[in-house]
């Protein structure tokens, strides 16, 4: 694990995660990647903690009834509303429809950006490698599209909504060889040159950089309006690695048997990260504990890379769906974005 101390990783994995006890009464919580794993387990915790409405964003709407039944199983008589909304982060039209639907919510307290994928084979969707399309461009087109709904919810209900990114310690291991390219995303989408064995870690680093840059952008235009928090749930026993080669999957399976947290415990981390609406702004939760942002986004090199990545990402997102971007007042095209277009 380049950039990661194995000793600290093991210690982290064996750190107990407390059961969340925050009261979410009256709140509406939206979770992406909620058909399985951490997202579904987090939804169950929000349900237990009295959330008023839980929105499960799932790629396959046919799984909706099963997901809702899982969340409701421990207290079927609860007054909490659980809904499934279709969302495929590689499909711009479903993102557009999802954002439009969210605008009709009377209240939106927290958005948990949990959906993600990992693969080592290059597969392009509309010209974008699938891991990037899911973990980066789709995630941030959705996040930016939901910002106006969060802002309006805050004003209407006198609250400070939260946007929570599910991160990964893997960002510390990312080689990210494309970081010095004139056009980072074009380099990442070059099937002949890019290293897919590094793709997941690199996507999580880009995700983290862009998330903190988005936080900075919102802070300037809408100060004290939305809390941005990143959460590292650690290695968890989910099927995230189901699409990687068999031999590596077997190695991962052994590592998970020895070190992984259960999906339920990982789900606790997401809930803990979403519980605080003020003091956790800009924080990075690890092992269920609030901490400072990673060095990757705070040291001079990281700050420069953060701003450059986000500038190029904005340009890319404007080319993907200018309507969603223009609908968010804080997303103004800067000179770099215009140049790249």
Curated annotation (Swiss-Prot):
Signal peptide stretch = none
Q: In which pathway does it act?
A: Secondary metabolite biosynthesis
The record lists NADP(+) as bound by 38, 63, 88, 114, 200, 204
Q: What class of enzyme is it?
A: oxidoreductase
- EC number, as in UniProt: 1.1.1.-
Superkingdom of the organism of origin: Eukaryota
Keywords recorded for this protein, A-Z: NADP, Oxidoreductase
GO molecular function terms noted in the UniProt entry: oxidoreductase activity
Q: List the disulfide bonds.
A: none
Record's note on what induces expression: Expression is positively regulated by the cluster-specific transcription factor FGM4 and is induced during infection of coleoptiles of wheat seedlings. The fusaoctaxin A gene cluster is silenced by H3K27 trimethylation by the histone methyltransferase KMT6.
How is loss of this gene reflected in the phenotype of the organism? Produces significantly smaller lesions and fewer spikelets with blight symptoms on susceptible wheat cultivars.
Q: Catalytic residues per the record?
A: 167, 200, 204
Task: List the InterPro entries.
Answer: NAD(P)-bd_dom_sf, SDR_fam
Its biological purpose is as follows: Short chain dehydrogenase; part of the Fg3_54/C64 gene cluster that mediates the biosynthesis of the octapeptide fusaoctaxin A, a virulence factor that is required for cell-to-cell invasiveness of plant host. The 2 nonribosomal peptide synthetases NRPS9 and NRPS5 form an assembly line which likely utilizes GABA as a starter unit (loaded on the unique module M1 of NRPS9) and sequentially incorporates seven extender units composed of the residues L-Ala, L-allo-Ile, L-Ser, L-Val, L-Ser, L-Leu and L-Leu, respectively.
Query: Record's PANTHER family?
Result: DEHYDROGENASE_REDUCTASE FAMILY PROTEIN, PUTATIVE (AFU_ORTHOLOGUE AFUA_3G08550)-RELATED, RETINOL DEHYDROGENASE
Q: Which family does it belong to?
A: Belongs to the short-chain dehydrogenases/reductases (SDR) family.
Q: Please identify the protein, giving its name as recorded.
A: Short chain dehydrogenase FGM9
Q: Which organism is it from?
A: Gibberella zeae (strain ATCC MYA-4620 / CBS 123657 / FGSC 9075 / NRRL 31084 / PH-1)
Q: Gene symbol?
A: FGM9
């Amino acid at each position: 694990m380049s950039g990661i101390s194995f000793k600290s990783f093991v210690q982290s994995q064996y750190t107990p995660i407390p059961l969340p006890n925050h009261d979410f009464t009256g709140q509406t919580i939206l979770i992406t990647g909620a058909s399985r794993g951490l997202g579904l387990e987090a939804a169950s915790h929000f349900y237990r903690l009295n959330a008023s409405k839980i929105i499960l964003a799932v790629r396959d709407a046919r799984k909706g009834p099963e997901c809702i039944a899982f969340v409701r199983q421990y207290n079927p008589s609860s007054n909490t509303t659980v809904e499934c909304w279709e969302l495929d982060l590689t499909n711009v039209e479903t993102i557009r429809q999802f954002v439009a639907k969210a605008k009709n919510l009377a209240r939106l307290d927290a958005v948990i950006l949990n959906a993600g994928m990992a693969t080592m084979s290059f597969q392009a969707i509309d010209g974008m490698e699938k891991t990037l399309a899911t973990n980066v461009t789709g995630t941030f087109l959705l996040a930016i599209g939901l910002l106006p709904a969060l802002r309006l919810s805050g004003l209407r209900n006198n609250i400070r909504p939260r946007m929570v990114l599910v991160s990964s310690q893997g960002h510390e291991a990312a080689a990210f060889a494309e970081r010095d390219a004139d056009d980072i995303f074009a380099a990442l989408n070059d099937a002949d040159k890019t290293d897919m064995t590094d793709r997941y870690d690199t996507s999580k680093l880009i995700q983290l950089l862009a998330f903190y840059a988005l936080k900075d952008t919102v802070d300037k235009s809408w100060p004290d309006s939305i809390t941005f928090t990143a959460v590292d749930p650690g290695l968890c026993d989910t099927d995230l690695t189901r699409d990687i080669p068999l031999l590596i999957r077997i190695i991962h399976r052994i590592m998970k048997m020895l070190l992984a947290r259960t999906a339920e415990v990982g789900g606790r981390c997401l809930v803990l990260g979403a519980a605080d609406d003020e003091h956790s702004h800009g924080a990075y939760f690890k092992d269920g504990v609030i901490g400072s942002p990673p060095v990757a986004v705070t040291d001079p090199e990281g700050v420069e890379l953060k701003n450059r990545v986000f500038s190029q990402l904005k340009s890319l997102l404007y080319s993907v769906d200018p309507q969603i971007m223009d609908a968010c007042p804080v997303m103004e095209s800067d000179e770099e974005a215009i140049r790249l277009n």
